[in-house]
């Protein structure tokens, strides 16, 4: 806004917005509504935060006539068996998307549809698991409440000390703003966005320091983790976080310190007291750790 950029938010539900951001309510699954809003607003940049259906991306590529479409994706990479992922590790898929897709599969197909366009001006931001205040997945709450109760935390022995795929919501927002800056050459490129060098162990120990308690980690084989015990995994078959070289070099992105993210997230936790559904199995976890 300080640079004279008008920001317009949108979604299916009408919402009251403040002085500096206006709002357009529409259903993106209805092409006529999407076309109407894009025609009326005529955005230079379209930031797509929530899409994981390839048909909706295809509609955007047909109807958006601006300068840059920024698609927020996820860790679309194949299993890399503990190697940090680089942007080029994702290869667009062959064939046509199936009728039913989970979130990860949907994001992969969305990126595939973008890659199949000829000249469409897309840019992709790829965050891994995102946490921060009001995290609707409650995954970060799973670790906060387990550290707070003083019992042991079950972690995957194969992967808890290697770099994990984690990002702070503010860092992802900053990366999106950088990607929306038309002065940067991000034409038809993807960018990794995450913490750097932060493992699951670092996360848990950071939470414990912020709470003033001693962390109690109990490593066990990944395959033996009870459901919901460690929502961030990490699955040892997956990538060990991201390589951030391209985002640094081309966008000017730098990840924040873990401590800054935890301070803000812990303040939310202490007020809201959220609980992850997997915490219902806490007695089973304690029994596995021999602490029941």
Regions found by a protein language model. Name each.
Residues 5-12, 16:
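Conserved glycine-rich Rossmann-like NAD(P)H-binding loop of the short-chain dehydrogenase/reductase
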Residues 14-67, 71, 77-79:
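NAD(P)H-binding glycine-rich loop region in Rossmannoid oxidoreductase-like domains
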Residues 74-102, 116-118:
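Active-site "gating" loop of Rossmann-like NAD(P)-dependent oxidoreductase/epimerase domains
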Residues 106:
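Active-site helix of classical SDR
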Residues 111-134:
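Conserved beta-loop-beta element that borders a ligand/cofactor-binding pocket
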Residues 144-154, 162-198, 209:
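Alpha-helical substrate-binding/gating segment
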Residues 178-238, 264, 273-292:
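Mid/C-terminal beta-alpha module of Rossmann-like enzyme folds, strongest
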């Amino acid at each position: 806004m300080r640079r004279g950029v008008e920001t317009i938010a949108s979604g299916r539900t009408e919402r009251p917005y403040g002085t500096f951001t206006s709002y357009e309510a529409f259903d993106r699954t209805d092409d006529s509504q999407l076309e109407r809003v894009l025609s009326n607003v005529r955005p230079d940049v379209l930031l797509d935060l929530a899409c994981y259906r390839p048909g909706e991306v295809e509609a955007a590529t047909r109807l958006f006539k601006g300068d840059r479409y920024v698609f927020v994706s996820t860790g679309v990479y194949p299993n890399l068996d503990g190697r940090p992922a680089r942007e080029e590790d994702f290869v667009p898929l062959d064939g046509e998307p199936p009728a039913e897709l989970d979130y990860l599969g949907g994001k992969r197909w969305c990126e595939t549809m973008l890659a199949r366009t000829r000249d469409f001006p897309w840019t992709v931001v790829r965050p891994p698991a995102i946490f921060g205040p009001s995290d609707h997945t409650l995954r970060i709450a799973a670790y906060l409440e387990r550290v707070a109760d003083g019992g042991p935390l079950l972690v995957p022995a194969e992967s808890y000390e290697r770099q994990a795929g984690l990002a702070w919501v503010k860092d992802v927002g900053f990366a999106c703003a950088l990607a929306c800056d038309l002065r940067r050459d991000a034409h038809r490129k993807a960018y990794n966005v995450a913490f750097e060098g932060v493992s699951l162990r670092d996360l848990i120990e950071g939470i414990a320091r912020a709470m003033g308690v001693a962390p109690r980690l109990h490593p066990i084989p990944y395959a033996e983790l009870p459901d919901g015990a460690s929502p961030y995994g990490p699955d040892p078959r997956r990538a060990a976080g991201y390589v951030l070289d391209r985002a640094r070099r081309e966008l000017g992105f730098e990840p924040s310190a873990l401590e800054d993210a935890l301070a803000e997230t812990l303040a939310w936790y202490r007020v809201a007291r959220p609980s992850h559904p997997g915490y219902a199995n806490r007695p089973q976890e304690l029994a596995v750790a021999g602490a029941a």
